[in-house]
């Protein structure tokens, strides 16, 4: 059992490093500070709350490495949902299978990969969001996610009238023995198999990395 709580590691890091640079995409001038990342996560958490996403719901994520990929990942796990990262090299049939097999309710995806997928093959997905700007690319019939997205700035202002600050960071209380990620293998024998990872698994990697002189 790892002493440090996986979710609390994020919470403490954002608070302690608020003004420091956190993420920059290669070849881009835009840099997200830890505070920027925490604020983006708060927006996504508000979206999840308004859409009644529950703790333990699965949310799929596929795209090349980017700042917004990282932010989406962190937003899911710190909300208490389970992230399902999918290799961007998987073919569309494998992607459809993983999304359905994992019972993912939302999908964050790059625009290029979304163009290769078929909506009618992931019918249980309630909403699909672009990794370029988090706009809603698709919503299931009966959902009002696109309308909700238009009012998200207003809802953020209502919830945080003085702006989102370090003091507002409060993430899910989740024991390290809970599953936080389902990681699918490359599927060398048939379709991919899902490996369940707990907070202990990931906290162990983080705490070890902190001991390195990088």
What function would you assign to each model-found segment?
Residues 88-120, 205-214:
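Conserved ATP-dependent adenylate/AMP-binding module captured primarily in the ANL superfamily
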Residues 33-35, 171-172, 180-206:
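Conserved AMP-binding A3 loop
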Residues 2, 22-66, 70, 74, ...:
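Conserved AMP-binding/adenylate-forming core of the ANL superfamily
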